[in-house]
């Protein structure tokens, strides 16, 4: 059986234009992805550039609206600044893309560019190579993956990585059945954000930083084309497809920094 798992590839960073204070407890938070977060002196309004197909748009829109109910963060939907196939990053924004990226072994791939632990741009790729297949071409998998990758882009790690246990009612939870209707993972749906997810996200963002990108300040920008380009120094989470028997697994690896964002 093909299962989903996730690979974290952490690359060293050299870009030092943005230096921000990291919450003192970040390294202790179970749902913090290496302490990565968007630096903020107040609330965040993060532009979400739409580079996805019409098929993906309702799922991306729903996930953005759901994450935007958090008390610290709003995703601001904007026109995309790239193409689905290229999915180039734009400084100060998250660009979300869909395309047929081929047999890469991943369904969704989130890349963040950081200075220290402060995120200054991110991309999300949704791989139609797999979503055009019957197993994944359904509303539950599409919504769960879009929701989870957008959570990762905020610095939130996954809630659970075991595919065969009961769903916990969170898009950050791995499952063979995110719909909760097939009798394999209980009856809870894993397509939305749980109260626990919001609690963990709020723990990450409860402590203010000393700086904030002007592009992420509420009301500052609504056009990603006005944002300057950044230097690629990516760190990535990938939701991959692989055969690991009856158990999902998580792996961590390191790769050298390259001149372009990598896709595994």
Give the residues covered by each predicted segment.
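N-terminal secretory signal peptides that target proteins for export/translocation
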Residues: 1-6, 261-264
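Nucleotide phosphate-binding site architecture
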Residues: 232, 247-248
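C-terminal membrane-anchoring or membrane-association module
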Residues: 248-264
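N-terminal leader/signal peptides at the extreme start of proteins
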Residues: 3, 227-228, 255-258
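Generic hydrophobic alpha-helical membrane-span motif
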Residues: 154-155, 239, 249
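Zinc-dependent metalloendopeptidases
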Residues: 25-229
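Short, threonine-centered small-residue motifs that mark membrane-proximal processing/anchoring sites
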Residues: 11, 15-26, 223-241
């Amino acid at each position: 059986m093909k299962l989903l798992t996730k690979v974290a590839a952490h690359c060293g960073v050299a870009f030092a234009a943005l230096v921000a204070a990291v919450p003192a407890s970040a390294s202790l938070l179970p749902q913090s992805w290496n302490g990565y977060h968007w630096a903020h002196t107040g609330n965040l309004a993060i532009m979400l550039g739409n580079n996805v197909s019409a098929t993906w748009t309702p799922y991306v829109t729903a996930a953005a609206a759901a994450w935007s109910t958090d008390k610290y963060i709003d995703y601001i939907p904007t026109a995309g600044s790239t193409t689905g196939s290229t999915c180039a990053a734009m400084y100060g924004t998250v660009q979300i893309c869909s395309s047929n990226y081929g047999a890469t072994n991943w369904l969704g791939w989130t890349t963040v560019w950081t200075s220290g632990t402060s995120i200054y741009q991110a991309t999300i790729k949704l791989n139609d190579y797999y979503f055009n297949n019957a197993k994944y071409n359904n509303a539950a998998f599409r919504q769960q993956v879009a929701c989870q990758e957008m959570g990762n882009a905020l610095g939130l790690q996954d809630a659970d990585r075991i595919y065969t246990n009961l769903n916990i009612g969170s898009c950050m939870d791995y499952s063979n059945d995110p719909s909760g209707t097939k009798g394999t993972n209980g009856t809870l749906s894993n397509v939305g954000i749980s109260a626990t997810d919001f609690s963990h996200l709020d723990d990450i963002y409860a402590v203010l930083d000393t700086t904030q990108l002007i592009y992420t300040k509420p009301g500052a920008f609504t056009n990603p084309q006005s944002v300057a380009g950044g230097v690629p120094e990516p760190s990535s989470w990938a939701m991959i497809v692989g055969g690991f028997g009856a158990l999902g697994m998580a792996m961590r690896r390191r790769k050298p920094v390259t001149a372009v964002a990598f896709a595994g």
